[in-house]
Amino acid sequence: SSDLSKMKNKKCSLLSMLVASVLCVGMFAGCNNAKAPETNNKVEGQNVSSTIQKTKARTVITTDGEVDDMNSVIRFMLYANEVDLAGIVVTSSMYHYAGDEEKGIEPFRWTGTKWVDEFIDAYEEVYPNLSVHAEGYPEPEHVRNITKIGNISDAGEMDEVTEGSEYLKELFLDDDDRELYVQTWGGTNTTARALKSIEEEYKDTDKWEEIQKKINEKVVLYIILDQDDSYGEYIAKNWPSIRIINDRSNFWHFAYAWKYHNDEVNSLLQGDWMYENIKANHGPLLEKYALMGDGNYIEGELEEEQRGTEEYLKNNSEYNRYDFISEGDSPSFLYLIDNGLRSMEDPTYGGWGSRFGVVNDNLWKNTELDYNPYTNQYEASYSLTRWFDDIQNDFAARADWCVAKTYEEANHAPTVKVKEGIDLTAKAGEKITLTADAKDPDGDEITYKWWRYAEADTYEDYKGQKNETEDTYAGDLLLDTTRKLAENEVVDSIKLEGSDTNKVTFTVPEDAKSGDTIHIVVEAKDNGKINLKHYQRVI
C-alpha cells in the first residue's frame, strides 16, 4: 500500500513487504480435561497471593512526539494510577528532531513540545472523574512539574546538557532504590546524556564504583526500536551492565502493522469500535486520541503522514474512517501493570507487553515465541497480539471513567486470587488442585477460565527436533520471528479438568524434572457492559 512505502518514516515505513507475509492472528489457546489420582499441593512459603503488598513500578517516559507516541501518552494517563510516574521527558529520534538554526540543522517531522502541556490540561479536566473510579491518579500539577524537555535538536544529539538530561540524572542518582523503568519511545540520546553527565562527574572519584553499582541495579531501559545511535555508541559501551528490554519487532503489531492481522486479533482496532468506545463522547482527553480520517492535523508532521485527513484515507484505501492508527510504544508501560500475570517478575513470563527471551544477564529481546492456534505455528508477535481484546476492553472501560461522575456509572475489573498460593512445588505425577476466588466491585457475574501458558514453562512437552526459526524483515527492520511445527510436535500435553470453573485440576507430567516450571493462568471475567478481566498466574 502507499501507506507502507515511505522508507524513511518511523513505524509506518518498510512495511509494504508485509503484504505477502503470513502474520499471526488469534487469542487464547484452550485447555482440555483429564483425570488423575489426587494428592495434596505443597505450597512453598507463605500464601503470597494474599500476603505480599506489591509496590507500584516506578517509571519515566521519554518520547519524540510522533502521533503514536501521543496516543500512547493518552492511554498511559488512564493507567497512571497503576504505576509511579517519575517524569515525562521530550527527546528526539532519527525520525523526529527540532533542528538547530545556529548549527544549520533543519527540523524534521518535529511536532513541538506544546502537545504534552495540552494533553496534561485535558487530563486535568477528566482527573476528578478518574479519581472517582480508582485511587492513585497523579495530580495534574504534579505531572506538569515532572515534564521536561531533553535533547531534541538532532538525531542522537547528546552533547548538550539539557533540562531533561539533568532531570534523568537526578532520578538515576536519587535515594529511591526501586527499579526505574525508562520507557524509550524515541531515541536514547537524552538518557545517554544523563549517564554521560554522571560519568563525567564521578569517574575520577572514589565514588565511581559505588555509583556504577547504583545505576546498574536501578535503571532498566525499555527500548522500543533503536531510534538513534546513542545506545550502541555510548550506553552499551560505557554502561554495559544496565539492564535492557529491547522490543525490536513485537511492538510493530500494536503499531502500523496491525492491519495485517485478522479479526481474531484486531476486531477491537477497527474504526466503528474505536470511535464509539474510545473517541466519541469520552471527554476532552480522548477527543485528542488520533484515529484514521478523524480530521486531526499535526503541525510539523509531513503531509503524507497526516493520517487524520481525507487525502490520507483516499490514498490509503485499506483503512476505514476512525480505524486505529498506532500505539507502538504502549507495550512498554502495559508490561508494568500489575494485572496478575506477573510479567514484571521476569521478562520471559509474558503479559500485556509481550514476552522476551534472555540474550545475556542484562539483555532481553523478542526471541520467545508463542503458539498461535489460528496459524498453527509459533510466532514472537503472538505473545503480544494474543492480549489485544483484553487490552482494548480495559482501555474502553477507563475511557468511560473519564465521563462517569459516579462509580455506579461505569464498569471496573474484578480481582482474583488463588487459594493455594501462586508459587507451588510438586512431584512428577502428582495431581494439583487450584481454587480461584474472584470478586467484582460492581457485583457483576464472574466466569472463570484456566489455561496453561505452556510457552512460558521450562518444562518441555515436545523433546524431538524442532524446526528452525525464520525471521521476517521489511528492509532492515525485523517484523516477526516464526517457527513452523515439526511433524508430530506436541504443543500442550497437560490436560486441565474444570477449566471453566473456579477449581481446576491437572497432573504434573511423569517426566517432569526437578526445577521444571509449569505456568497456569486463571482469568476472571465479568459480565459488565464491557467484559473486563483480571488474571492470576500460578507457577
PLM-predicted stretches and their roles:
Residues 518-520:
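Hydrophobic beta-strand segments within extracellular beta-sandwich modules
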Residues 37-435, 439-471, 478-480, 484-492:
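N-terminal acidic, glycine/proline-rich low-complexity segments
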Residues 525-531:
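Short, solvent-exposed loop/turn segments at the edges of extracellular beta-sandwich modules
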Residues 5-18:
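Bacterial N-terminal signal peptides that target proteins for export
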Residues 495-500:
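Short beta-strand segments within Ig-like beta-sandwich modules, predominantly Fibronectin type-III
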Residues 505-514, 527:
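Short, surface-exposed loop/turn segments at beta-strand-coil junctions that are enriched for proline
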Residues 27-30:
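C-terminal motif of bacterial Sec signal peptides marking the signal peptidase cleavage site
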